[in-house]
Every structure is written in structure tokens, then in C-alpha cells.
Amino acid sequence: MKVVEVKHPLIKHKIGLMREGDISTKRFRELATEVGSLLTYEATSDFETEKVTINGWNGPVEVDQIKGKKVTVVPILRAGLGMMDGVLEHIPSARISVVGIYRDEETLEPVPYFNKLASNIDERIALVVDPMLATGGSMIATLDLLKEKGCKNFKILVLVAAPEGIAALEKAHPDVELYTAAIDEKLNDKGYIIPGLGDAGDKIFGTK
């Protein structure tokens, strides 16, 4: 599995700001969008382009356009919605596929409860977004579902990943690519990433 920890100074700075314990909902939400945007820039750097001719201001002109890449953005509810707009800033025509999975606080196992996927998802590259890759259970369950529907190409975008989650994801889905702004130290006994960001969903939505 390809794992890319994006070490651009802007990303590192913004993730550092997100670690503040008393950060406001507004600021956390803004930063989640901004880092999601920067991760998208990195994750799409290998998209192929082709030459096409358009009508320019002074007649025909040859330009580069992305070649035949249909994209669907897949936010994992609910926290993944906080990164979605950052992706759409770069790919505004992307279709949106929504997957609802929550983590049982007792067992830490993923529990699917909803999905609404783009048509022809088997022909699309899926950019799956979720702020935290902790145990990896929710991400693995999401990829299981997408593969069942015929999707073959995946790029995973997360703000923070734990080594345990990376290992679990690689074991279950070695064919995907993971892009993260930070690889943190470990999980605690409750399955939270240390040092992490806290509960990203609560911070994005202003709930507890």
C-alpha cells in the first residue's frame, strides 16, 4: 500500500493549529477544509492530462486537461463532510457518494447505517475522506462496500493516521493509496489517536 505523509510546511502548520485543545468550531472547520484541499492537490498529482484544442481569445489554442478521470468524493459520515469542500475546491464537477458508518464505543467495531453512491461508481476514482484513521475499521468497511459496488481505484485522504490503522488498512486493502497530513504516535485504550486532534466530528459540528 502506498502511504504518503504530506510534509508541506503549510500542512504541518495547519495541523499544528488544529491540535489546540480549546480551538473553536469555526476555526477547526476552516482548517479541516484547508488541509483537505492541500491533500487533494497532492493526491491528484499523478492524474494524466491530454492536449485539447479550445477557442481562445485570439483563436484556437491547445491546452492541457485531465484525461478521462471521473471522480467521486466519498465522505464517511459524519466527520468526513468536514473535508469534502476542500476536495471540491479542486474538482467541483466530482460526484458525491455518501457512506454512513459509526464506531461502536464499546467494541470499537464499525457499524454501517447508510449509503448513497454515485452512478457508474465502477468507472470512477474514489477519493475517500475522513479526518481520522484510528483503528481503520470504518475505512475498511467503507472500502469493502465500494468494492462490492465495483469501484476499483481509491485514494484515501485523512488528516491524522495512527500506525495501527495504517497496518490494518494495508492488511485489508493493500491496493489503495493513503495520503495523510500526519502519522501520530499510537492509539489509547479507547481507540483514540494520541496526540491526535480529539473527536474531529464533535469539533467540526460543535457537538459533544
Curated annotation (Swiss-Prot):
Q: Which controlled-vocabulary keywords does the entry list? A: Allosteric enzyme, Glycosyltransferase, GTP-binding, Magnesium, Nucleotide-binding, Transferase
- EC no. given is 2.4.2.9
Pfam families, per database record: UPRTase
Its annotated pathway?
Pyrimidine metabolism; UMP biosynthesis via salvage pathway; UMP from uracil: step 1/1
Task: Name the reaction it catalyses.
Answer: UMP + diphosphate = 5-phospho-alpha-D-ribose 1-diphosphate + uracil
Q: How is the cofactor bound?
A: Binds 1 Mg(2+) ion per subunit. The magnesium is bound as Mg-PRPP.
Its transmembrane ranges are none
Q: Which Gene3D superfamilies match?
A: 3.40.50.2020
Q: Tell me, which GO biological process terms does this entry list?
A: UMP salvage; uracil salvage
Q: What class of enzyme is it?
A: transferase
Q: What does the entry list as the binding residues for 5-phospho-alpha-D-ribose 1-diphosphate? A: R78, R103, D130, P131, M132, L133, A134, T135, G136, G137, S138, D199
Annotated uracil binding sites? I193, G198, D199, A200
**GO terms of molecular function:** GTP binding; magnesium ion binding; uracil phosphoribosyltransferase activity
Q: What is the annotated role of this protein in its UniProt record?
A: Catalyzes the conversion of uracil and 5-phospho-alpha-D-ribose 1-diphosphate (PRPP) to UMP and diphosphate.
Q: Which NCBIfam families match?
A: PRK00129.1 (NF001097), upp (TIGR01091)
Please give the family membership noted in the entry. Answer: Belongs to the UPRTase family.
Q: What is this protein called?
A: Uracil phosphoribosyltransferase
The organism encoding this protein is Aliivibrio salmonicida (strain LFI1238)
Instruction: Cite the source lineage.
Output: Bacteria, Pseudomonadati, Pseudomonadota, Gammaproteobacteria, Vibrionales
